[in-house]
């Protein structure tokens, strides 16, 4: 490509398209074609070598090679706004966006570079040095919301990173010397990453830590007379679309056990396609060339022998990006989104006579045209008004044109006037907020044409994060205010990120930061922050400190009105004298305490006492602080106790004696401290604490006599469990309940190996069931005794507890499933993660219960 093909300063000439969407029926599916942007010549896709678009309507990245061995990557929004230009790169072979909004670029040698949406390098992943040159790559979504990457080299070895943000590399080598005809990588929900390799009609699958195994259970649907050339996992990670050399498309389950749909295309040689993927949940696309795309209905409702439903669309040098709810076509002069319409949208916009939403929409249209009698007539045939209102709101969220959105929202509001009860407007108000946000994001200046389904999938926090990543701070603040109000935490986050990036940009530049330059930056940032009174300027000062610009931080902090924040930043700057003066001027003792403690921790005693002596209030509070330090040793301890006794502060006296009892190693001194605490509590008049301390101080001497001063009551009962007389004595002394004694006795007998005594105890009717016997035997590895006590277990709660103690998670799950007890089943599922072999089976019970 010549230099003239990529102008150095391309202009943003995209235009938002507000034309109504067109649609076609594809069997039981209706595809909507929405032209999002027109005149997008600045995207300059004609000479692109590599193209990739971020999911959820994020930026695009294109790679040009104007000369041999010379590569440049540009990053733009979908509308054409440039985020990064002429980013040089050496021999890229693969580009893809991760779900974390990062661009991954892989070179021929197997080194993956991770960039932000502004082209800033974040990290890199170096695959095995023994790996040969890269042959192909696949990225896949993870359960954590991130992306993983699988790289196949020219020898067929697959190296995998489960998460690009936390790269740990593992690899898998197929048993055959030839290359697979199709392959993919995916991570089913709550499972390990799987690699699927297809060698003509032989399917091999394996996951981390396992070898590749042939999937013989797929034989029921595999066409062994041809070879499979494409396989693509859907966004839900529950199905795979397969393509054969003979023109057959099959939709199969993720574990390859079931084939849901088979379609055979005879009009096109689809095996020679250049792209293949999903369009929503029930259709796929086959890109035959840059100028032809074939859409195919693969709905599970199709029956064998049904006519194949396809739609051919001519395009102009189209590049395709796949979204969770459709695909986006980037053509020479426009950007178009293709989606399978929702049930509500089909019902309302197609004026279906059997749908209440269509009647309500028609009534609103008649009303807007001034024909009220027709409007009333249309509204009288509505059977379920609430469903009609919901359908109109849902359709308004799914449409692109503001006029149509307004009319649909008016229809919903019109319907609310006819409801028998006071309408709940929560859903309508939320829809209005979200539509306002979506319309702003779709503007050319922002260039994020999110659909409502995409917005709901990623959430408002993720949208704001993406705007921050792209440097669109003003739009991010608007969105945060519209969705969360003026004082939204997201507004603070956007502002502080703008501050951080503004300061970081200056600190990393080579420009000299003299006083006038610092004052100009302070004026710029402070002027913006002062528009939002709830945002602290002290946070900007902290960002300046982190960027090693202390003088800028001092300029910021002059404007801070909160004394606590002002003092905290001055301490971070280690300007203790200024912090002390500010704290003293505020007349707030807690701030002076904060500064004094900082001095005591960071300076020598002579230094901080000299600084404190200059400020009378600080000196007074320092003396009080020394008295309250409460050091439980030497003269300070005696002085503290004397002060407390002089002040008749019985509450603090009690706490003081508690501290002594906790730290004292001598049992006699500990007992004396407890008795003094009891006396102080009595003087305080707190009967509850006095009674507790009375019991403790009565029990403690007996513990000392037995040489068990350091043992708790529980440990003592367990230790003496075989001696029923001593256990009875302990029960009386410590005022224990029958249940406590029985539980601890069972544990003690199992621990000591007193199996005959334990069996005699079990012969009596147990008020706490027999699960504790099983638990104790399992805990202390009395394996020969477990079955004996398990046979006595009865009742649902006891059986579940016993199975859990024995780590029989599947059996426990069966009991909970039979009772339809979701809470217990969920608890069993959480515990079953200890055993990877049982966890999937328990998970099946939980999912089955949720589906029912």
Curated annotation (Swiss-Prot):
One of its GO terms (molecular function) is actin binding. It comes from the Eukaryota. One of its GO terms (cellular component) is endosome. Probable core component of at least two putative endosomal tethering complexes, the homotypic fusion and vacuole protein sorting (HOPS) complex and the class C core vacuole/endosome tethering (CORVET) complex. Their common core is composed of the class C Vps proteins vps-11, vps-16 and vps-18, which in HOPS further associates with vps-33.1, vps-39 and vps-41 and in CORVET with vps-8 and vps-33.2. It holds the Pfam family Vps16_C. It is found in: Late endosome membrane; Lysosome membrane. This is Vacuolar protein sorting-associated protein 16 homolog. Plays a role in vesicle-mediated protein trafficking to lysosomal compartments including the endocytic membrane transport pathways. Believed to act as a core component of the putative HOPS and CORVET endosomal tethering complexes which are proposed to be involved in the rab-5-to-rab-7 endosome conversion probably implicating sand-1, and via binding SNAREs and SNARE complexes to mediate tethering and docking events during SNARE-mediated membrane fusion.
């Amino acid at each position: 490509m010549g230099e003239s093909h990529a102008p150095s300063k391309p202009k943003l000439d995209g235009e938002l398209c507000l034309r109504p969407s067109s649609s076609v029926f594809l069997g039981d599916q209706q595809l909507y074609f929405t032209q999002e942007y027109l005149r997008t010549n600045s995207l300059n896709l004609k000479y692109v070598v590599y193209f990739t678009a971020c999911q959820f309507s994020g930026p695009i990245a294109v790679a040009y090679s104007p000369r041999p061995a010379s590569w440049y990557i540009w990053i733009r929004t979908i509308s054409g706004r440039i985020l990064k230009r002429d980013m040089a790169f050496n021999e890229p072979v693969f580009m893809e966006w991760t779900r974390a909004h990062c661009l991954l670029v892989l070179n021929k040698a197997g080194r993956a570079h991770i960039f932000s949406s502004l082209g800033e390098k974040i990290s890199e992943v170096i695959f095995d040095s023994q790996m040969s040159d890269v042959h192909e790559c696949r990225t896949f979504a993870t359960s954590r919301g991130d992306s993983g990457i699988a790289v196949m080299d020219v020898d067929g070895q697959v190296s995998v990173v489960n998460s690009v943000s936390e790269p740990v590399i593992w690899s898998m080598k197929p048993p055959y010397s030839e290359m697979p005809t199709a392959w993919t990588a995916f991570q089913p929900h709550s499972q390990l990453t799987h690699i699927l390799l297809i060698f003509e009609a032989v399917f091999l699958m394996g996951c981390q830590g396992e070898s590749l195994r042939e999937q013989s259970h797929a034989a029921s649907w595999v066409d062994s007379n041809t070879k499979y050339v494409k396989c693509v996992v859907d966004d839900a990670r529950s199905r795979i679309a397969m393509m054969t050399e003979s023109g057959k498309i099959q939709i199969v389950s993720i574990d390859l056990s079931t084939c849901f749909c088979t379609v055979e295309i005879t009009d096109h040689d689809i095996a020679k396609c250049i792209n293949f993927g999903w369009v929503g949940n029930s259709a796929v696309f086959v890109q035959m060339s840059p100028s032809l795309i074939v859409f195919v209905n693969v709905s599970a409702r199709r029956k064998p022998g049904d006519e194949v439903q396809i739609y051919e669309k001519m395009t102009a040098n189209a590049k395709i990006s796949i979204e969770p709810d459709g695909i986006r076509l980037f053509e020479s002069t426009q950007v178009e989104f293709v989606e399978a319409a929702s049930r509500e949208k089909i019902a309302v916009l197609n004026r279906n006579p059997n749908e209440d939403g269509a009647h309500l929409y028609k009534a609103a249209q008649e009303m807007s045209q001034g024909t009220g009698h027709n409007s009333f007539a249309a509204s009288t045939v509505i059977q379920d008004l609430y469903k009609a209102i919901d359908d109109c709101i849902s359709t308004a969220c799914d449409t692109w044109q503001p006029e149509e959105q307004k009319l649909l929202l008016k229809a919903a509001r019109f319907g609310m006037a006819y409801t028998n009860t006071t309408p709940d407007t929560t859903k309508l108000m939320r829809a209005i907020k979200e539509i306002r946000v979506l319309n702003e994001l779709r503007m050319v200046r922002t260039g994020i044409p999110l659909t409502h389904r995409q917005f709901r999938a990623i959430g408002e926090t993720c949208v704001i994060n993406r705007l921050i990543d792209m440097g669109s701070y003003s739009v991010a603040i608007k969105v945060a205010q519209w969705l969360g109000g003026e004082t939204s935490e997201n507004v603070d986050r956007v502002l502080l990120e703008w501050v951080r990036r503004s300061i970081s940009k200056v600190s990393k530049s080579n420009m000299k930061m003299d006083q006038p330059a610092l004052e100009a930056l302070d004026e710029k940032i402070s002027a913006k922050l002062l528009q939002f009174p709830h945002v602290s300027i002290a946070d900007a000062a902290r960002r300046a400190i982190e960027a090693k610009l202390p003088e800028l931080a001092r300029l910021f902090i002059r404007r801070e009105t909160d004394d606590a924040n002002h003092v905290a930043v001055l301490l971070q700057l280690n300007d203790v004298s200024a912090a002390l003066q500010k704290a003293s001027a505020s007349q707030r003792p807690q701030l002076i305490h904060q500064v004094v403690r900082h001095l005591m921790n960071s300076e020598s005693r002579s230094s901080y006492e000299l600084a404190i002596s200059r400020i009378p209030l600080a000196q007074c509070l320092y003396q009080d602080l020394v008295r309250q330090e409460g050091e439980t040793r030497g003269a300070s301890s005696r002085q503290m106790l004397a002060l407390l006794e002089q002040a008749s502060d019985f509450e603090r006296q009690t706490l003081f004696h508690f501290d002594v009892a906790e730290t004292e190693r001598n049992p006699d001194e500990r007992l004396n401290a407890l008795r003094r605490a009891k006396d102080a509590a009595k003087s305080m008049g707190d009967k509850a604490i006095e009674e507790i301390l009375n019991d403790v101080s009565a029990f403690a001497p007996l513990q000392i006599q037995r040489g068990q001063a350091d043992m708790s009551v529980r440990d003592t009962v367990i230790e003496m469990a075989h001696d029923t007389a001593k256990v009875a004595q302990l029960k009386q002394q410590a005022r224990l309940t029958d249940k406590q004694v029985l539980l601890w006795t069972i544990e003690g007998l199992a621990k000591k190996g007193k199996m005959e005594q334990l069996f005699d105890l079990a012969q009596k009717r147990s008020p706490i069931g027999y699960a504790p016997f099983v638990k104790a035997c399992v805990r202390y590895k009395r394996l020969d005794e477990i079955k004996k006590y398990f046979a006595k277990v009865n009742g649902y709660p006891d059986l579940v507890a016993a199975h859990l103690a024995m780590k029989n998670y599947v059996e426990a799950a069966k009991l909970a499933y039979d009772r339809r007890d979701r809470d217990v089943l969920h608890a069993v599922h959480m515990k079953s993660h200890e055993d990877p072999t049982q966890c999937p089976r328990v998970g099946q019970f939980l999912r089955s219960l949720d589906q029912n």
